[in-house]
A protein has these predicted regions:
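Extended repeat-based scaffolds of very large eukaryotic assembly and lipid-transport proteins
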Residues: 1-75, 107-112, 123-140
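Conserved binding-pocket/active-site segment within a compact domain
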Residues: 80-142
């Protein structure tokens, strides 16, 4: 694939968060497939996308978190969970009650996806995640 084609393919991939469904719905899937992107290249881009979205995590809105939750369904959910928990444990107190509840809900969904994937499941990470959810929800109720 030429450099220019690689850039165009990556732009499409990032625009739709790697989702073939969304590419198809918007009429860009056939164009994307013409670039013959390898699965290995897509894995590299997914990793870049996860890093980008983690850098965009905010207690002011939850768009990046929502995208990460969606990505966890077809990518390394455990790695996404690890990064979301790291951010949340440091920053969740900055958010209002609504944001705290949304974060708890999304983290729970990522936990479910992590358990479904069941690749070398780290129970310590799951337990830390549940502890963070409990602590955050107690804070909301107080």
């Amino acid at each position: 694939m030429e450099i220019n084609e690689n850039i165009k393919a990556k732009d499409l991939f990032m625009k739709y968060n790697g989702s073939y469904f969304h590419m198809t719905r918007e009429g860009d899937y056939d164009k994307y497939k013409q670039y013959n992107v390898t699965k290995d290249q897509e894995l590299i881009w997914k990793s870049e996308l996860v890093d980008k979205l983690c850098n965009e995590l905010s207690t002011d809105n939850f768009n990046a978190l929502s995208s990460l939750t969606t990505l966890a369904g077809n990518y390394d959910a455990q790695e996404i969970l690890r990064k979301v928990i790291a951010y949340t444990s440091k920053n969740i107190q900055k958010g209002d009650s609504f944001i705290k509840i949304i974060y708890c809900e999304q983290i729970f969904e990522i936990i479910e996806k992590t358990i479904k994937q069941n690749k070398n499941l780290q129970t310590k990470l799951i337990n830390e995640s549940f502890d963070l959810i409990k602590k955050t929800l107690k804070d909301v109720l107080n």
